[in-house]
Amino acid sequence: GQNVLDPVLVEQLEALPEVKHAFGRMYCPLPAEYQGKQGSIDLISYDTIQFDWAKKDLISGTLPQEPEDGTYPVLTVFDKSNSLTVGDTIQLEDAKLTVVGVLNDSPFSSTDSPIVICTEETFHQLTGQNCYAVIDIQLKDTTADAAIAQIHTLLSDTLNKQVVFSNRIEGNRMIQSTYWAFNLVVYAFLIVIAGITILNIINSISMSMAAR
């Protein structure tokens, strides 16, 4: 969870022909005061691409723009333990954040602290950090095992093997296969039910005609 990944890595990864997108996120837990109580927040940075993807999960408010009146606009993520809403303010040690939007989902694990999402520039201004804790990579061809191995080697060599490399492609393939198999079973079941219903109707008509 430490911010140790140089942003140059994102540029190097995006330069590879097999890579569709590469993007990083910074992370920092911060003490904060909000809704009249002392607590903490999990501050996470998004770049432009991630904010574009977040639009579909926006359930209220807008995406963050530039800071106004000395306050930094941020998003938060809806959760049963997070009661922050649009318009709420979060007071840090020497800065104030304003919630301008709420997401109904995020790729982060739920914690006891509210997830607060800001721009990379805001993150840098608030924490002084500009390295990433996580870099995500999307491939143009998810079956390109050679490309995956090349990326793995690049990251391991660059970071002196001090990196956790997680390949979610195989897991996503299994999820997708399970999804289609489930749909196939459901549709087959519906077809059988429809066939039985039609046969019952035909039998009822035949019995009615025979009774006459």
Where are these regions (language model features)?
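Short beta-strand boundary microenvironments
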Residues: Q2-V134
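Short conserved AdoMet
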Residues: E14-P17, S156, N160
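Structural beta->alpha junctions
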Residues: V102-S106, I137-A144, R168-N172
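A short beta-strand structural signal in non-transmembrane regions
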Residues: Q129-L154
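Peri-transmembrane interface segments
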Residues: Q150-H152, T158-I198, M207-R212
